[in-house]
């Protein structure tokens, strides 16, 4: 039966009594970059509501004569046939055995570096190997070799940087920039002041007039390094501005080649929207087209073959996981929820692009399921449900008992059970990985999340516009970042004891910043479409009310500056030295932020997933790399 075909009126006598797990409000701490709230009266109704509601809004009248709004989203792009008929031969034993042999051969290449590389190139060669195995997506096999190589490089690091080799007389920008980018990501403390030594007498970066390939690559690595900036590092901002301008001008001069494509990819995706598996797919093409690399010794041939094979072998794992996800989607009754977006395959793809180690199946599937649930709830609270129905649903979730569905309208019953069953199942998976029961902890997160939705539903129903600060504090919770990350993260083979979890999850600054980025970036991409659907409240509208006379362009500029600053703070939270939390424990939450950020890079890629998001699915999930 279609879940929205029967919508009986809610009985006034039915009351879902509940006891929340915690009396705490779980209010996120104030965000450090909120604007000054002006001392002016707040309008209770939006002055733009009448005009925005007159725009195209999809509505339907249910069987109980309730007028309901829907988003008019496009349908699911990946039906059962697309998934079920995926075929790949790369799951066969012969390919895996070939991969194991290649791994051993690449290990031999790492080992031979100390013998083959001269003292005038030993540093850059080690950095080259580390950088390439990471960009090709095969670094998980060489953790010990990478550490040994970086230990060696760091032992020669100075306040002025490094040269190409240990016997080099002068420091080298390419070696220093590549080292400066790579070392912090592995926990080695280095100062941005090292880049000051590559400026001229008046404190400006300068380019070499010869513009050789090495000069250009120096600028590529300087730009890549500049993106891992911390707050207050002016030299990093200068390096980014200078190298970005240089590379854009270079693209206009050089012919189409592997180097030009590499520059284009780096400028297009940077770091914070360059998902590791997506980067690997793009870099495989760049690496394979580089004639200089292919004329080199066996290093490049082995690296490239292993990267291609690993990429395709993982697709055989993805096929099995997609079949499992499709069964869950059907069994949960999702196809009958016709008012919502169905983007479970897209969410799975994002998870696969940030965690493609085979053992992290639980994370990938959990993330896709959690995000699908969040999307259903988002559309139900923002559009389809009435305020009274949503109050009943929120109360029923806090009871956490299937009998609570007796109080709910018919269309909500299946949604409730999808949430209930999936959260319980993910908690069981997390208990296996973490060795303790985390269900109550997860329930608290979902309760707070729905409370934030309930607040927004009331704002929409009344037309009330909150202050910017009020909206952002609630919006960081309703962004869904925390509940999308928490349980999938706990299924991984990374220990998250309570003292570590509190530094990664709520109430940590890492969590607060990640949620802020998702809310701010999401609003800059979605506010016009949301307003057309009658959802007036956004960071943009609240900023404009707080600042009379400000235009939408002013608001967008302000938010973009905020986002840039928050990204730098997030970099610091991930990489700050002397942290009690390993980078590996923080990295998955950081990478989830990158995944969401990618989805909003060009547009709302979750509502309109038929362009860039579809391309991501095709390129990383469905299309193998030609060997």
Swiss-Prot record:
Q: Which Gene3D superfamilies match?
A: Farnesyl Diphosphate Synthase (1.10.600.10), Terpene synthase, N-terminal domain (1.50.10.130)
Which residues does Mg(2+) 3 bind?
Answer: 530
Q: Which superkingdom heads the taxonomic lineage of this protein's source?
A: Eukaryota
Under the heading Pfam families, the entry gives:
Terpene_synth (PF01397), Terpene_synth_C (PF03936)
Give the pathway annotation: Terpene metabolism; oleoresin biosynthesis; Secondary metabolite biosynthesis; terpenoid biosynthesis
**Chain positions recorded as Mg(2+) 1 binding sites:** 378, 382
**What EC identifiers does the entry list?**
4.2.3.-
Q: Which residues bind Mg(2+) 2?
A: 378, 382
Which SUPFAM superfamilies does the UniProt record give? Terpenoid cyclases/Protein prenyltransferases, Terpenoid synthases
The UniProt note on the cofactor reads as follows: Binds 3 Mg(2+) or Mn(2+) ions per subunit.
Any single GO molecular-function term of the entry would be: terpene synthase activity
Q: Which cofactor does it need?
A: Mg(2+); Mn(2+)
Which InterPro entries is this protein grouped with?
A: Isoprenoid_synthase_dom_sf, Terpene_cyclase-like_1_C, Terpene_cyclase_plant_C1, Terpene_synth_N, Terpene_synth_N_sf, Terpene_synthase-like, Terpene_synthase_metal-bd, Terpenoid_cyclase/PrenylTrfase
* GO CC annotation terms, alphabetical: chloroplast
Transit peptide location: 1-50
State the compartments where it is located: Plastid, Chloroplast
| Any one biological process term the GO annotation gives | terpenoid biosynthetic process
Question: Any idea which UniProt keywords this protein has?
Answer: Chloroplast, Lyase, Magnesium, Metal-binding, Plastid, Transit peptide
DDXXD motif, short sequence motif: residues:
378-382
Q: Which family does it belong to?
A: Belongs to the terpene synthase family. Tpsd subfamily.
Functional description taken from the UniProt entry: Monoterpene synthase (TPS) involved in the biosynthesis of monoterpene natural products included in conifer oleoresin secretions and volatile emissions; these compounds contribute to biotic and abiotic stress defense against herbivores and pathogens.
Q: What is known of its domains?
A: The Asp-Asp-Xaa-Xaa-Asp/Glu (DDXXD/E) motif is important for the catalytic activity, presumably through binding to Mg(2+).
Q: What is this protein called?
A: Monoterpene synthase like 1, chloroplastic
Q: Which organism is it from?
A: Pinus contorta
Give the encoding gene's name. TPS-mono1
């Amino acid at each position: 039966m279609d879940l929205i075909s029967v919508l009986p009126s809610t009985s006034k006598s039915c009351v879902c009594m509940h006891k929340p797990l915690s009396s705490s409000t779980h209010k996120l701490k104030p965000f450090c970059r909120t604007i000054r709230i002006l001392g002016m009266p707040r309008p209770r109704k939006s002055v733009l509501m009448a005009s925005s509601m007159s725009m195209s809004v999809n509505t339907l009248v249910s069987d109980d004569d309730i007028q309901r709004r829907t988003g008019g989203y496009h349908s699911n792009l990946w039906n059962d046939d697309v998934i079920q008929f995926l075929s790949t031969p790369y799951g066969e034993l012969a390919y895996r055995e070939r991969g194991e042999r290649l791994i051993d051969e690449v290990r031999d290449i790492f080992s031979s570096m100390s013998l083959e590389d001269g003292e005038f190139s030993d540093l850059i060669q080690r950095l080259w190997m580390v950088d390439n195995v990471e960009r090709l997506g095969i670094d998980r096999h060489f953790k010990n070799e990478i550490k040994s190589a970086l230990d060696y490089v760091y032992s020669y690091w100075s306040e002025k940087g490094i040269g190409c080799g240990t016997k080099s007389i002068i420091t080298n920008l390419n070696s220093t920039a590549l080292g400066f980018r790579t070392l912090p990501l592995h926990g080695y403390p280095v100062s941005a002041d090292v880049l000051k030594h590559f400026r001229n007498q008046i404190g400006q970066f300068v380019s070499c007039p010869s513009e050789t390939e090495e000069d250009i690559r120096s600028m590529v690595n300087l730009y890549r390094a500049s993106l891992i900036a911390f707050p207050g590092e002016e030299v990093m901002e200068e390096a980014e501005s200078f190298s970005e301008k240089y590379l854009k001008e270079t693209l206009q001069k050089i012919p189409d080649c592997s180097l030009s494509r590499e520059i284009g990819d780096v400028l297009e995706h940077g770091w914070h929207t360059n998902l590791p598996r997506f980067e690997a797919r793009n870099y495989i093409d760049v690496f394979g087209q580089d004639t200089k690399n292919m004329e080199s010794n066996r290093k490049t041939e082995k690296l490239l073959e292993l990267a291609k094979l690993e990429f395709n072998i993982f697709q055989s794992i993805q096929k099995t996981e997609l079949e499992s996800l499709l069964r869950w989607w059907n069994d949960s009754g999702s196809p009958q929820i016709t008012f919502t977006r169905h983007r479970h395959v897209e969410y799975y793809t994002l998870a696969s692009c940030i965690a493609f180690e085979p053992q992290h199946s639980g994370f990938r599937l959990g993330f896709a399921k959690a995000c699908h649930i969040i999307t259903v709830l988002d559309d139900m609270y923002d559009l389809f449900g009435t305020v009274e129905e949503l109050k009943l649903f929120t109360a029923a979730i806090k009871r956490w008992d299937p009998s609570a569905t007796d109080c709910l309208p018919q269309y909500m019953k299946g949604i409730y059970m999808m949430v209930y069953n999936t959260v319980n199942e993910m908690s069981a998976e997390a208990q296996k990985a973490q060795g303790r029961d985390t269900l109550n902890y997860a329930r608290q997160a979902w309760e707070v999340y729905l409370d934030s939705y309930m607040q927004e539903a009331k704002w929409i129903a009344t037309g009330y516009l909150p202050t910017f600060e009020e909206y952002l504090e609630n919006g960081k919770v309703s962004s869904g970042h925390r509940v999308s990350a928490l349980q999938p993260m706990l299924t991984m083979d990374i220990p998250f004891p309570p003292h570590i979890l509190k530094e990664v999850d709520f109430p940590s600054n890492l969590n607060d910043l990640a949620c802020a980025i998702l809310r701010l970036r999401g609003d800059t991409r979605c506010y016009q479409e949301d307003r057309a659907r009658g959802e007036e409240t956004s960071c943009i509208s609240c900023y404009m009310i707080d600042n009379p006379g400000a235009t939408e362009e002013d608001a967008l500029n302000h938010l973009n500056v905020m986002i840039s600053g928050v990204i730098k703070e997030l970099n610091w939270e991930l990489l700050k030295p002397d942290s009690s939390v390993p980078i590996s424990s923080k990295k998955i939450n950081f990478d989830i932020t990158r995944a969401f950020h990618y989805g909003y890079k060009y547009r709302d890629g979750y509502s309109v997933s038929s362009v860039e998001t579809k391309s991501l699915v095709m390129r990383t999930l469905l299309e193998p790399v030609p060997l």
